[in-house]
Amino acid sequence: MKVSQYMTRTVLTITPKTPFRQAFDLMHSRGFHHFPVVEDDHVVGVIAERDLLLAAANYGSAEVPVDEIMRGAPVCVTENSQLKYAARLLVDNHIGCLPVLNTRKMLVGIITETDIFKIIAGMLHARPTATKPVKKVVNKAIEKPVKKVAKKAVKKSTKKAS
């Protein structure tokens, strides 16, 4: 499964000089949690909601540009990357999104931890369900061996008693 099959292709971006208050307002009005920061058609960083919340607490001015608070050197994937690789990058780097780049290193999409969860949830939901309750199946499977062991135990205990 490739990232290109599941990524969001229409990506809202901001520039490094976008004031953090504007980025915060835009994030909340659109319901996003991350923005790629793009300059000259290349991703130069990622800003997350938590970065903006920390900035709001630590900076006195809402005009501080996001390049002062963003995470530089973003972790990215290509559109041909395997989905499991993208998921591993998210987990290993403790991040919530990955900008998706084409072969020219230009932004073509984004994949988020929410996208990955939706894919996993869809796979789990698509699994066939048992036609019989699991308890009955398990009980039936162990019934005969347990009876055998119980009979042997009874025989041994009666031999010892005699």
Where are these regions (language model features)?
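A short, polar/charged loop-to-alpha-helix boundary motif
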Residues: 53-66, 117-129
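Histidine- and aromatic-rich ligand-binding microenvironments
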Residues: 19, 47, 51-52, 64-69, ...
